[in-house]
Amino acid sequence: MKMYRQGDVLIVEAKRGRPMRGQVKPAADNVLVYGEATGHAHRIEGDAVIMDTAEGKTIEAARPFRVVHDEHDTIEIPEGFYRVVRQREYDEEQIRYVAD
């Protein structure tokens, strides 16, 4: 299983056809995650399709694509099917997303 990380976003290779709960719909834009601190966004460049599901976002790409962010190096990801994970900080008192 391949994984790619850009700041607080983890992109994990997934199996196609994995059953998903609830409604699956195309995302409204090319943004994976909006940054909390600066407002910059982790976004896709290329022909990849982002889908919103009850479990989070997925990416399906027939060709390599790029993930870009104003404060991180651009990463190139090969074609495939991926799950998008927003990484969280661990604290015994509370769970919160990693500040990017």
Report residues per predicted region.
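Long, low-hydrophobicity ectodomains and other hydrophilic envelope-associated domains
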Residues: 1-68
